Structures are given as structure tokens and as C-alpha cells.
Regions:
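Short hydrophobic alpha-helical segments enriched in small aliphatic residues
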Residues: 3, 10-12
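Aromatic-rich, lipid-facing transmembrane alpha helices and their immediate juxtamembrane interface loops
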Residues: 21-264
């Protein structure tokens, strides 16, 4: 039993030389876990407001639950904030001039987020046959996944984070990470999050099978819009949560109707 405990301690600490280093490692992990949660939630709110008031794809100005998950979080923003948080700690003092130093740092952050956005979009297109967003109408876009316009937005958001959020988030997160109840809070969030991921991936698997059988890439937002049209046709209530679910027909029949409308 003692030997098993030692082995578990070894792997948890990832070869830490002392208990203090192990504690530091776990604290950093909790900080990143919390930042992922904050980024996912903040990104969801940002997308919610953008789609409601500014998106050309929503002329009726309805509230639309963004992303493919049910809950109020977007993992893309969570991963992006973790990367931006880590980049905010790098030493760029070798660059002369304060303004140039910050410009290079923010550009590095923006390009990093753009790369995350690109690979995330590519994974869904190649792996799931689903396109979650489409920048095809934007100038100089690459495969409709990324474009200079949104890279510029990431640059602005990186600057806002660095000057307004990062100085305060360091103290608050370190305080939270030092409290035991915080670990429970993080665990609760990830428990709900993983259940949501499982439910949403089941929907995506159905979409993937249909898309592969018909050799198409399903435009997720167009399909969501089609679901809304079917909901109106069947006189069902609009759903902000579980927006891909219909009471009268299955997801497979919804996909068939979507295919007949947009691809035939």
C-alpha cells in the first residue's frame, strides 16, 4: 500500500523534487483550470453579444446560444486565454522600446490565438465534417477559418487583457488557488462541462455520419438556422438551451431536410 501511494505521488507530481515543488505544480494547474473556465465563459458572453447586435448572419437580432455546447462556455476561448496568460509572463526585455515591446507581445498573442482558431476549425472540418464558423465572406481569409479582421480583434483583446485584466487576475487567482474550496469549485465545473461535451459530441457524431455518407461539410450555423425554421413549422417554442433538439423529428430527419434544401 505504501509503495502504491509513493507511485501515485510520483506521477501526480510529475517528478517534482520536493513536496513544495509538487504543491507549486498543482497550484499552477488549478490556476490554468480556472483561467480556462473564465475564458470559456467570457468568450461565450462575447459571442452572445456579438451575434445578438452585430452579426450579419442574424438579421432578426435574436439571442443565439453560440458554439456547439449546451452550456455557457466556449472552449476555444478558454484555451486561448490560457495561452495569452502564459505569454503575458514571457520576458521580451531584449526588444528595445516599451511601445515596440508591447506591440510585438500583443502580436504574438494574436497570432497564437489565430493558430488555435485555425487548428480547432480544421479539426472539426477534417474530423467531424462540420464547419462551426465561416469567414468565407471576409477578405484574405484562409479556408474560411481565419482572416486578418479577426486576428486584429484578437490583437485588441490581447491588449485589453494585458492592461486591464492580467494585473488583477494574478492576485485574485492566486488567492483562490490557495483555498481548498476552490478545488471543489473547479471540479464541479469540469464535471458539468464533461457531461455537456459528451452530450454535444453525440449530436456531432450523428452529423458526422450523415455528412460522410453524403460527402458534404455541414455548415453548423446554417443547420442551426434550419432547425429554427423547422421549429417554427412545427409550432414549437424557441429554445436558447438545447437549440439543436426538436420534439417532432429526430436529428437524422432534420439533417435530411437540411440536405434537401441546401444541397439538392
Amino acid at each position: 500500500m505504501f509503495a502504491q501511494t509513493r507511485i501515485i505521488h510520483y506521477y501526480v507530481c510529475l517528478g517534482a523534487a520536493s513536496g513544495k515543488e509538487c504543491k507549486v505544480f498543482m497550484k499552477e494547474w488549478l490556476i490554468l483550470a480556472f483561467i480556462f473556465f473564465i475564458g470559456s465563459l467570457a468568450g461565450w458572453l462575447l459571442e452572445l453579444i456579438f451575434r445578438r447586435f452585430f452579426s450579419k448572419a442574424n438579421p432578426s437580432r435574436k439571442w443565439i446560444n453560440p458554439g456547439f455546447l449546451v452550456g455557457p462556455y466556449l472552449p476555444l476561448y478558454g484555451f486561448s486565454l490560457c495561452v495569452v496568460y502564459l505569454l503575458a509572463h514571457i520576458n521580451v526585455s531584449f526588444i528595445h522600446g516599451v511601445y515596440l515591446r508591447k506591440t510585438v507581445l500583443f502580436l504574438l498573442m494574436a497570432l497564437s490565438v489565430t493558430l488555435i482558431e485555425y487548428f480547432a476549425g480544421l479539426i472539426f472540418i477534417k474530423g467531424m465534417h462540420v464547419k462551426l464558423w465561416d469567414y468565407s465572406d471576409e477578405k484574405f481569409n484562409i479556408q474560411g477559418i481565419i482572416c486578418p479582421k479577426f486576428t486584429f480583434f484578437w490583437y485588441l483583446l490581447s491588449a485589453i487583457y494585458y492592461f486591464l485584466i492580467h494585473p488583477n487576475i494574478i492576485h485574485s487567482i492566486e488567492w483562490l488557488a490557495g483555498n481548498l474550496w476552490f478545488s471543489f469549485f473547479v471540479g464541479l465545473f469540469y464535471g458539468v462541462f464533461l457531461i455537456d461535451v459528451g452530450y454535444s459530441l453525440n449530436i456531432l457524431n450523428n452529423i458526422q455520419k450523415f455528412a460522410k455518407e453524403n460527402d458534404i461539410i455541414v455548415q453548423y450555423e446554417a443547420f442551426r438556422k434550419h432547425i429554427g425554421e423547422l421549429r417554427n413549422e412545427f409550432k414549437e417554442k424557441e429554445r436558447f438551451v438545447f437549440s439543436m433538439k426538436l420534439d417532432h423529428i429526430s436529428i437524422k430527419k432534420s439533417l435530411k431536410a437540411y440536405f434537401d434544401k441546401y444541397y439538392k
